[in-house]
């Protein structure tokens, strides 16, 4: 599932959003720097900073809604899904709440929830808590500004270890009964222990029917140099919760860590290669129902790292041109749609041979290494099974089956 075969269509629209007509959205953030040509590319909206409590109510009881109003209007005027980012977080929170008594803090949190609910009655996806593992609303020291310092008002760790998150979601269910509730976190695709911790929290929320969606941020610092098999494995752990998954804050730099590209061509090709390696893992996964990029124009938060997809003159970088073509050409399935079932045996491989059952609808079988490099390709011609000779060094590989539209991937162990 590292990269699907792209079929060239005779015509790919350059005037409507990239994912128009697709079962999954491909969205982006609302900010002044990202507005130009937004509707030409994207069909979902999340405010970058406008929905953070510290942006709206920097001064107690003085509300600044204008930017959040504009983000919401952009979504609703164009029938794009709107994700509210974010109610509870340990960053960019009002400084005035930090030293209030806990009971008063809780009352202010309720007022914040109520104000958002009243002003924006049709929020599609409500990000209740952002970064519960990484950045809870706890003041660590005097230099920790913007944390909110209200974790205790929400119950602290409590008996579950996550009482404050559970309270946040209970309040969200109360004030936003029509919205889908989502939690969000980063550095999941690169860390299985962290992913398992996140799944534990999700299961606590599921036990009270408090959560509808799961967010994975997808920033490049969590996918750079991470094997495709690791990304997919951790994504599958989260998908096993049987909740829809959203990639909430996706970006890819045009350089490796602490590396400066020699020239624009090198930068473009690096970013393009990483988009081809990483994006299909998420886009083709049947549990992933949408991807939100965290900016695409100069002025986005990772401009210095070269993550923008559009140049300063407005021209598209190669990764953006590829993204439009790829999404247009790739037919994806969602979790509740019928998917082909295939089995591998023996797995681990014995004597360099493996048999694949259930290939009657399959056109191609590819063997990839864990970095996504294609090692073998086999045409199946709709046979019910296929046997392969695998003269491969010991290790973990990916075996990818494609019906010409969608690909399906499993891990294969060669001892």
Feature locations, PLM:
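Boundary/entry segment of secreted carbohydrate-active catalytic domains
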Residues: 5-50
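Glycoside hydrolase catalytic-domain groove-lining segments
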Residues: 66-78, 158-184, 195-260, 279-284, ...
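Structural preference for beta-strand elements that scaffold enzyme active sites
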Residues: 23-27, 44-46, 81-83, 123-127, ...
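Aromatic-rich peripheral "rim/lid" segments of glycoside hydrolase catalytic domains that contact
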Residues: 10-16, 57, 115, 127, ...
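Substrate-binding cleft and catalytic face of glycoside hydrolase catalytic domains
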Residues: 33, 40-58, 66-188, 252-258
């Amino acid at each position: 599932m590292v990269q699907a075969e792209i079929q060239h269509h005779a015509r790919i629209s350059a005037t409507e959003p990239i994912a128009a007509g697709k079962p999954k959205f491909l969205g982006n953030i609302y900010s002044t720097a990202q507005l130009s040509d937004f509707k030409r590319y994207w069909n979902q909206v999340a405010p970058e900073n406008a929905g953070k409590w510290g942006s709206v109510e920097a001064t107690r009881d003085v509300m600044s809604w204008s930017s959040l109003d504009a983000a919401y209007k952009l979504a609703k005027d164009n029938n794009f899904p709107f994700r509210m980012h974010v109610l509870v977080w340990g960053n960019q929170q009002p400084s005035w709440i930090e030293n209030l008594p806990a009971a008063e803090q809780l009352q202010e949190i309720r007022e914040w929830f109520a104000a958002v609910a009243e002003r924006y009655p049709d929020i599609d996806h409500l990000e209740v808590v952002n970064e519960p593992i990484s950045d809870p609303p706890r003041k660590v020291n005097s230099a920790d500004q913007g944390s909110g310092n209200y974790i205790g008002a929400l119950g602290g760790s409590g008996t579950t270890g996550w009482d404050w998150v559970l309270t946040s979601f209970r309040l969200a269910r109360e004030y936003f009964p029509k919205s889908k509730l989502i939690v969000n976190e980063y550095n999941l695709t690169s860390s299985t222990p962290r992913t398992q911790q996140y799944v534990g929290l999700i299961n606590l929320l599921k036990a009270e029917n408090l959560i509808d969606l799961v967010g994975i941020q997808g920033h490049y610092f969590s996918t750079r140099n991470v094997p495709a098999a690791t990304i997919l494995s951790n994504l599958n752990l989260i998908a096993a919760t049987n909740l829809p998954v959203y990639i909430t804050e996706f970006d890819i730099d045009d350089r490796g860590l602490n590396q400066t590209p020699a020239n624009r061509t090198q930068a473009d090709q690096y970013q393009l290669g990483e988009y081809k390696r990483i994006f299909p893992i998420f886009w083709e996964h049947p549990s992933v129902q949408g991807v939100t990029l965290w900016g695409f124009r100069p002025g986005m938060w990772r401009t210095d790292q070269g993550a923008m997809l559009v140049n300063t003159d407005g021209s598209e970088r190669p990764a953006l041109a590829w993204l439009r073509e790829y999404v247009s050409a790739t037919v994806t399935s969602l979790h509740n749609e019928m998917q082909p079932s295939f089995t591998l045996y023996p797995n681990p491989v014995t004597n360099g041979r493996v048999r694949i059952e259930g290939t009657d609808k399959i056109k191609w079988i590819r063997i990839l290494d864990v970095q996504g490099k294609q090692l073998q390709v086999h045409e199946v011609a709709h046979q019910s099974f296929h046997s392969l000779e695998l003269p491969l060094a010991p290790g973990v590989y990916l075996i990818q089956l494609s019906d010409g539209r969608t690909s399906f991937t499993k891990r294969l162990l060669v001892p």
